[in-house]
Each structure stands twice: as structure tokens, then as C-alpha cells.
Amino acid sequence: MRWPDDIDEVLDADVVVALAYRTPAGGVVISGVSPIGLRDRDAGTVGFTTSLGFGRKLERIRRNPQVALAFHAREHGRSRRADYVLVQGTVSEVLRPGEAYLRQEIGKRSERYLGAPRRGLFWDRWLRVYYRDRVLVTVQVERIVRWPRLDGGGEPEVIGSPLPEGGLRQSPPKQGTGPRIESRRAERRLGTVPHRLLGFVQADGLPMVVAITITAADGRGLTVRTAGPVLPAGGLRAGVLGHKFYEQVAGLTSRQYTGWLTVDAEDASTGIYAPHTERNLVIPHSKTIALLLNGLAATTTYRAAQKAGRERLLDRS
């Protein structure tokens, strides 16, 4: 599958995109990743890198490789286009590249988006695992959906297989569908970040990710709205990501939620989202602090990955 030049510009430009992957129960988790422009139009693939230490993410992708990447944020990037571009597909490869490829290909690409690596005796030791312990994930693109506005407004253009109707049919969780986290607290936290995204599984099994605004919070959950009628009628598991990031990702805020979305059949642009779990990460706006924390996290998670034997999740190079 091949996409046009204007979409390719967006795929090359964004510093941070939202990765949506499925949970075993049929929900969606959304997290930020840096694609560093990895793509191949001739092969119809888009890629991103992550850490071997993030084994839970890799395990879930291995179990169900249907994913989506939402190119939704232009700040600090290389394009001023207003398009919201959603790439949907199936992970075809999870590979730990050799050191030469990491240095020559991934390293050079990373510098364009994330800046030159810190050098010196301390930094070489502290960031050794962070720079070496990278996993390359390749997604075979099945569909691209492009909206003309970053808020998801306007008539969508679909490249590839047609969009299915509705979401994946699901049974409600045994613990009930109502909020398990105080809704007003979630509203306040999500109100501190500029980007808010909602993800759910479509009827064809691929995650859909849409931009949302939050207009209210009460005992039922968060009232979420989209710029167009894209929400599936009924109830299903869904994930929310609220985030912001600074230039070269020298600091970020991430608010992740999983929960239950309920949508009335009469209004496909409004839903009630009941948050069930949350995960918050704040890294101050400082390149030095960000690298210190990244180095610590990479070393810690890599040791955990070795202990858990997560190398089995990787393809052979």
C-alpha cells in the first residue's frame, strides 16, 4: 500500500505519535512513541522504536499485533500541515537491531528529532543501555485515515480497506462499567495537557484513535466529545491518553487511562468515559533531567527484561 506525498510529509515530521495497542480483554492502551520518520512507502510499512524493558507492551503486541499510530501533534516537528493522520495495521516484525544499525541508521535519525546524544565518560556509561537497548517495531499498513484538521474535524479520507461500522462487540467487565477512579480528578489532570486522545477497537479488530475534548465530569464518568461522528454506539473498553512534550522530548507529561466508553446511538460524537485505571508520568522540562531518568529507567527495565527472558519476544536479525 502506497500513500501520497502530503501524508508522507506528516509521517516524516512528527516527533511524538500515539501508539494504540490491544489488551487481552479487548481494550486499548495508548502511549507516546517516537517514530523518527521510520517508514517505507514501497513496502507499505511504518516503524517506531521502543525499549526491550517495556516487556508488557511487547507481549501484548506479540499476542495481538493489530495496532494504530496517530500522527496528531505538529509542535517541535518538521511540518505545519494541519492533517490528523491515523495509520492502522499489523505488526510484522519486532527486531532488536545490531549495534552498527543502531548507530548508523537509528542514531542518525534520532538526532534529527531528539538532538545529538550526550557524550563523555559519565554519559557514555549512564546512557549505554538506553541507546543500545532499542527494539525496532515494523507495522504493515492496512489503512490510513486522514482528517483535514488536527482536532479530527472535516470529512475523513480513507486509503486502503474501507472503515468498518461500529466497534468490537464486548461483554462488560465483571466489576462493572462505572468509574473506579474519581472522574473530576481525571478531568483536572487531563485539563493540564494539550493533547487528549481516545482509543477503542473497531469491528475489524484494528484500534481507532480519535482526538477528544472533555466537557464535564460526574458520577458517571467523563463526558467526551469528538469533532465528527466517529464513536461506536453501545459500550466497549477504551483507552485515553493525555500528554504534552517539549522540544526534543526534553521533558513530558503523560496521563494514561483505561476504562469503559458508553455511546448513545443517537449521537456518535458524544460519549461517557468511565476511567478504571490510571498511570501518570511527569518529567520536568530539562534535557539533563530527562536523560538521567531515561538512563535509570532503561537500565532498570532492561535488567527486569533479562530476568523475565523477554528476548524471546524478538525476531531474529
List the model feature ranges, each with a label.
Residues M1-A18, G166-L197:
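Short, basic/aromatic recognition patches
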Residues L11-T23, V67-F71, P194-V201, G239-L241:
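A short, Trp-centered hydrophobic/proline-enriched beta-strand micro-motif
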Residues L19, V33-P35:
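GNAT/GCN5-related N-acetyltransferase fold signature
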Residues R78-R185, R225-S317:
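Charged, gly/pro-rich active-site loop segments
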Residues I36-G77, T213-V249:
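A short mixed-secondary-structure module that forms the rim of ligand-binding clefts
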